[in-house]
């Protein structure tokens, strides 16, 4: 930073203009040395001569220098400054040292000038060319620093990109390794560790079978809207029905049980479902649980605990099917407090264990509901086109549905019904009670000739209930707490004792007609 020039200094400065100097940083070594020497000479010539007044003032200041030094030591080290005598009497070497100090410590010099100015010492007058030197050098340094910063940024960016690429490669390797490990584990599980639950193994084999079953003609895409393709939906339902149900030898492990005791148990379960206003599906699920438990259980079921089996089965089915199932304490009260809640829960664990946790079979009630929904015809719109209805909406009269449901309820009492699947029993009941036959075939997917044996078995029961209906003129039961559009789904009690003689007489009559080669008439 150049000091202010006095009038005397201006007189002694030569008027000749020196050529403009370039940046010393970019000059060769010899040129730099010569120019530094010239600068030192110029500075020496520009130092002002002191008069007597200035010398007296300087002596007074020198006398006080020791005092100021003492004060300055308290405040910190004094800033560096070059005395006037050193500039006046110094040699060329001293000037070179000063210039080297000034060129190396430019930043320190600016702070030193501020401190020296406050202490009253005059600053050496710097030529204007030095300012040009500083500006050019600072601009060059700035350019170099910017270039170096850019280089550093580029290097950092390259490093980051390399790290990202390495991480991506590592992730790909991890994914490949995980996939290989998963395949190895899966192959080990399939080969060395078979499914422990045999029921699940059968279900897995059937459900994963690629063979597709042709869907009935009435099962269109519109009726399966939101479910899936008709072929796939029907195939899954049929495969689910192929899971074996209980057989007629289900009481082989229970010597104290017989067919009559089983009928008594099912009769009581039906009465409980009616009193608690449970749905028909709940009753059919509970009976299925009881039958499969009796066939697979090694725990002997006797007259002392067979009611407990039915109670626990109802408790499980209600939790599976009902929105608001009764509590365990409610079922305990229905047994006249013969069993506690702990007894029911213990038996519940045993039932789900022995039936293999397979709690959702497609019962005959579900198949019948599906067939009737497929038989429903579409409604005409204003343009005289038929609109296909969703398969969830039943179209047949509820009274006919109730009559066929009672037939399926009664068939649960008979051991011989285990010979046939739920799907075929529901289709046979529909063949006997509904016309035309071609429509039933399109809804069930069966030809009538395929179900000849099943139809022969269910026909006497269907005719017995048709006679009973004409005598009693049954109506749909009404419940105050149940909505009218759901009342036909509530289980009703079928008087087994009054229906068994009628069914027996009908079977004898049909056998007599067949012996005479006569065919019975249609019911409806």
From Swiss-Prot:
Keyword field contains Cytoplasm: yes
Family designation: Belongs to the cyclin family. Cyclin E subfamily.
Deletion phenotype: Loss of cell division in vulval lineages as a result of lengthened intervals between cell divisons. RNAi-mediated knockdown results in arrest prior to the 100-cell embryonic stage. Depending on the knockdown, some animals reach adult age. In the 1-cell embryo, persistent ruffling throughout the embryo cortex and mislocalization of par-2, which remains cytoplasmic, and par-6, which is distributed throughout the cortex. In 50 percent of embryos, the first division is symmetric. Adult mutants are sterile due to a lack of sperm and egg production.
GO molecular function: cyclin-dependent protein serine/threonine kinase regulator activity
SUPFAM superfamilies: Cyclin-like
Name of one Pfam family that matches: Cyclin_N
Region feature (Disordered): 1-155
GO biological process per UniProt: cell division; DNA endoreduplication; embryo development ending in birth or egg hatching; G1/S transition of mitotic cell cycle; germ cell development; germline cell cycle switching, mitotic to meiotic cell cycle; gonad development; meiotic cell cycle
Signal peptide: none
Tissue specificity statement from the Swiss-Prot or TrEMBL entry: Expressed dynamically in proliferating cells throughout development. Detectable in larval blast cells undergoing active proliferation that give rise to all tissue types, including germline, intestine, hypodermis, neurons, and muscle.
Keywords tagged on the record: Cell cycle, Cell division, Cyclin, Cytoplasm, Cytoskeleton, Meiosis, Mitosis, Nucleus
Polar residues bias locations: 48-62
Entry keyword Nucleus: yes
Binding partners and assembly: Interacts with a member of the CDK2/CDK protein kinases to form a serine/threonine kinase holoenzyme complex. The cyclin subunit imparts substrate specificity to the complex.
InterPro entries with a match to the protein in the record: Cyclin, Cyclin-like_dom, Cyclin-like_sf, Cyclin_N, Cyclins_cyclin-box
Gene Ontology CC annotations of this record: centriole; chromatin; cyclin E1-CDK2 complex; cyclin-dependent protein kinase holoenzyme complex; cytoplasm; microtubule organizing center; nucleus
Function of the molecule: Essential for the control of the cell cycle at the G1/S (start) transition. In association with cdk-2, regulates proliferation, quiescent state and cell fate during the development of several cell lineages. In the embryo, initiates the establishment of cell polarity through the recruitment of the centrosomal proteins spd-2 and spd-5 during prophase. During the development of the vulva, controls the onset of vulval cell terminal differentiation by controlling the duration of G1 phase. During hypoderm development at early larval stages, controls syncytial fate of seam cell daughter cells.
Cell location: Nucleus; Cytoplasm, Cytoskeleton, Microtubule organizing center, Centrosome, Centriole
Protein name, entry field: G1/S-specific cyclin-E
SMART domains registered for this protein in UniProt: CYCLIN (SM00385)
Listed Basic and acidic residues bias regions: 18-47, 63-78, 86-95, 146-155
């Amino acid at each position: 930073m150049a000091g202010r020039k006095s009038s005397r200094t201006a007189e002694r400065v030569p008027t000749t203009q020196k050529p403009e100097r370039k940046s010393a940083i970019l000059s060769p070594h010899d040129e730099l040395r010569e120019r530094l020497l010239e600068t030192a000479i110029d500075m020496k010539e520009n130092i002002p001569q002191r008069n007597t007044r200035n010398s007296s003032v300087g002596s007074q200041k020198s006398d006080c220098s020791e005092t100021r030094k003492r004060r300055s030591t308290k405040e910190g080290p004094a800033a560096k400054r070059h005395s006037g005598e050193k500039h006046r009497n110094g040699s060329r070497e001293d000037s070179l040292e000063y210039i080297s100090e000034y060129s190396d410590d430019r930043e320190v010099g600016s702070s030193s000038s501020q401190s020296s100015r406050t202490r009253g010492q005059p600053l050496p007058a710097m030529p204007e060319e030095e300012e040009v030197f500083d500006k050019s050098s600072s601009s060059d340094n700035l350019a170099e620093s910017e270039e170096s910063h850019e280089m550093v940024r580029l290097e950092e960016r390259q490093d980051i990109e390399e790290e990202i690429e390495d991480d991506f490669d590592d992730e790909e390797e991890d994914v490949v390794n995980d996939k290989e490990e998963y395949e190895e584990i899966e192959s080990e599980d399939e080969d060395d560790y078979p499914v422990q639950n045999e029921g699940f193994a059968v279900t897995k084999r059937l459900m994963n079978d690629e063979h597709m079953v042709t869907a009935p003609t009435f099962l269109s895409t519109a009726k399966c809207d939101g479910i899936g393709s008709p072929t796939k939906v029907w195939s899954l339902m049929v495969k689910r029905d192929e899971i074996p149900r209980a057989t007629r030898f289900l009481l082989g492990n229970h010597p104290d049980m017989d067919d009559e005791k089983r009928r008594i148990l099912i009769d009581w379960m039906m009465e409980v479902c009616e009193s608690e206003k449970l749905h028909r599906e709940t009753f059919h699920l509970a009976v299925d649980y009881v039958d499969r438990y009796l066939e697979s259980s090694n725990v002997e079921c006797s007259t002392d605990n067979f009611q407990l089996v039915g109670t626990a089965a109802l408790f499980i089915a209600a939790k599976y099917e009902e929105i608001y199932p009764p509590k365990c304490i409610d079922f305990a009260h229905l047994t006249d407090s013969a069993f506690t809640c702990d007894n029911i829960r213990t038996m519940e664990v045993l039932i789900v264990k022995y039936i293999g946790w397979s709690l959702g079979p497609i019962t005959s009630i579900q198949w019948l509901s599906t067939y009737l929904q497929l038989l429903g015809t579409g409604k005409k719109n204003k343009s005289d086109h038929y609109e296909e209805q969703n398969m969830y909406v039943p179209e047949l009269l509820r009274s006919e549905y109730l009559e066929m449901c009672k037939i399926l309820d009664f068939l649960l009492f008979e051991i011989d019904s285990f010979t046939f699947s739920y799907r075929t029993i529901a289709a046979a009941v529909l063949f006997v009670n509904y016309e035309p036959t071609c429509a039933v075939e399109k809804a069930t997917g069966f030809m009538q000739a395929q179900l000849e044996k099943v139809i022969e078995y269910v026909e006497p029961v269907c005719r017995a209930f048709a006679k009973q209906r004409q005598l009693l003129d049954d109506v749909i039961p009404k419940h105050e707490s149940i909505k009218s559009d759901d009342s036909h789904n509530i289980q009703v009690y079928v008087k087994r004792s009054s229906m068994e003689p009628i069914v027996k007489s009908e079977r004898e009559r049909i056998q007599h007609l067949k012996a005479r080669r006569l065919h019975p008439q249609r019911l409806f």
